Amino acid sequence: MHIILHQPEIPANTGNIGRTCVATGTDLHLIEPLGFQLNEKSIKRAGMDYWEHLNVTRYINFEDFKSRHPGARIWMATTKAQHVYTDVSFGPDDYIMFGKESAGIPEEILIEYSDTCIRIPMLPTI
């Protein structure tokens, strides 16, 4: 399993996701631009001392990612999806992509991947 963060903005969020990736043996893929430097204290604080064990790859944009992973099955996590993540069967080589905190995944990408858009239900207070 792979996690993709598309243009993440908050270093602590990325650090926490990175720590979870280490704990689960999941690869992390970061698509630029990032809203922070990977050497910032806040990302290291969130990732604690696990960050050095993380298998992380950076890409200059989503096209760069696609060219380096042709044929990858990418699930788009979006509040706009009809299908809930529990409705699908994930494979060990699948990717789940999350968009930037302020805006989500760009609409043009969601249109391109409309068949693999999934929603993670949230309480209405979020």
Task: Go through the PLM ranges and name each one.
Residues 1-126:
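Post-transcriptional modification and biogenesis factors for structured RNAs
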